[in-house]
Amino acid sequence: MARIAGINIPDHKHTVIALTAIYGIGKTRSQAICAAAGIAENVKISELSEEQIDKLRDEVGKFTVEGDLRREVTLNIKRLLDLGCYRGLRHRRGLPVRGQRTKTNARTRKGPRKPIKK
């Protein structure tokens, strides 16, 4: 297994799909990384040489991924909470942040229904 950005990349998958195992890299960014490194998208990770894997590591290193990205997202949410703005209050209350309706739906964000005790 190749290790890129501290993550074990699955050997049996194609390069584009395997790179999406890294937090912060989706399919589009993965395709861009493969193109920049000069690696075909349909080649499996196990078929790559060490030089090609090093090229992939260099290209992935240009982006904010994994722990740094998680930390950045957490700090952004914490900043909103500290500001006390509307979005911060929605985060604090565990409600949808981006204007979705909450009279019905929003169950994922609000959690399971709490029965009214009589």
From Swiss-Prot:
Against InterPro entries, the record matches this protein to:
Rbsml_uS13_C (IPR027437), Ribosomal_uS13 (IPR001892), Ribosomal_uS13-like_H2TH (IPR010979), Ribosomal_uS13_bac-type (IPR019980), Ribosomal_uS13_CS (IPR018269)
Region: Disordered, residue numbers = 94-118
Q: Which domain of life is it from?
A: Bacteria
| Signal peptide from the UniProt entry | none
SUPFAM superfamilies documented for this protein: S13-like H2TH domain
What is the name of this protein? Small ribosomal subunit protein uS13
Report the protein's function. Answer: Located at the top of the head of the 30S subunit, it contacts several helices of the 16S rRNA. In the 70S ribosome it contacts the 23S rRNA (bridge B1a) and protein L5 of the 50S subunit (bridge B1b), connecting the 2 subunits; these bridges are implicated in subunit movement. Contacts the tRNAs in the A and P-sites.
Q: Which GO terms describe its cellular component?
A: cytosol; small ribosomal subunit
Query: Tell me, what's a Pfam family for it?
Result: Ribosomal_S13
Q: Per UniProt, which keywords does this protein have?
A: Ribonucleoprotein, Ribosomal protein, RNA-binding, rRNA-binding, tRNA-binding
Q: Which gene encodes it?
A: rpsM
One annotated GO biological process: translation
Q: Gene3D superfamilies, alphabetically?
A: 1.10.8.50, 30s ribosomal protein s13, domain 2
Q: Which family, according to UniProt?
A: Belongs to the universal ribosomal protein uS13 family.
